[in-house]
Amino acid sequence: MAITGVLGYSGRYIAAEAERRGWRVVGLTNSAGRLPNPAGYELRPMPWSTGENVLEGVDVLVNTYWVRFSYEGAGHAAFSHAEAVENTKLLFDSARRAGVGRVVHTSITQPDTASELPYFRGKAELEQALAATGLPHSILRPAILFGDTPEESILINNMAWSLRHLPAVATFGWGKYCMQPIHVQDFAELALDEAEKAEPACIINAVGPETYSFRDTWKMLAAAMGMWRPVLPVPAWLGYRAAQVLGTLVGDVMLTRDEIAGLSQDRLAVPGATIGTRRLSHWLREHADTLGRRYASELARRK
């Protein structure tokens, strides 16, 4: 089984679950030598980094590769959604040429080829590209991942960091739009269940068992941490400017315009069945003392 991002976040949990089930794991990464490999996985470069087909002999490909936002700032290599789309198409083509038996691909809730948001539009384009390969596949659509450590749960951890450092926090508008976070271990188990299926194609909304409005997430998080902060509704433009200022202070991109728009359009929640048993409300109580003690930087992960 080949897994992208095996040294990163969700890929690491998927790899560990695969080994528990008896799979031999091959990691696809461009971070060899930069990130630790304590499990000692065999590592191969991403297909777009080499002229070789790195998927030869692979039975199943699990893809978690993506970028959260496009970036062209100083101090880091540029990356973009457009580049991630093209790279992933090359990955799918490599899988097709190598005769990979099944692909499990990580998408997003409510992808849309007509969206003005590159994140959701790109994810929809990739779902179509995967289907066009003719390979048996499963498409998993998570909204937000959390667990197992606070630093790995960037959104939740940095909301907690804001509560610890700011006199008030904000929602964009009234904050009634919802999120359905799924624990990374539940997601890993789902990915392996799908890897071992024989269905030709399926799409699963990989959302957790609890649904919260953005406003209620602030309140629940503050309550778990034993503190109170006013939650102020602000216009999206003002919230973005505040995120820019805070991002400058911590040397990171805290939140983008597109992410605010995706939240406000209620794209991170879907009706229907949910996946997994691990609840964010329980996890917050277990990790309340350590949440937000340190800011979790997206850009630092990419150095």
Pin down the residues of each PLM region.
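N-terminal Rossmann NAD(P)H-binding glycine-rich loop of SDR-like oxidoreductase domains
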Residues: M1-R21
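Conserved glycine-rich Rossmann-like NAD(P)H-binding loop of the short-chain dehydrogenase/reductase
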Residues: W23-N30
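Oxidoreductase cofactor-interface core, primarily capturing Rossmann-like NAD(P)-dependent enzymes
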Residues: P38, A114-M227
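SDR active-site strand-loop-helix element
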Residues: T4, L28, T64, V103-T109, ...
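A short helix->loop->beta-strand "cap" motif at the edges of active sites that frequently abuts
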Residues: R97-R102, L135
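NAD(P)H-binding glycine-rich loop region in Rossmannoid oxidoreductase-like domains
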Residues: A32-A98, T109-T113
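Mid/C-terminal beta-alpha module of Rossmann-like enzyme folds, strongest
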Residues: L190-T256, D266-K303
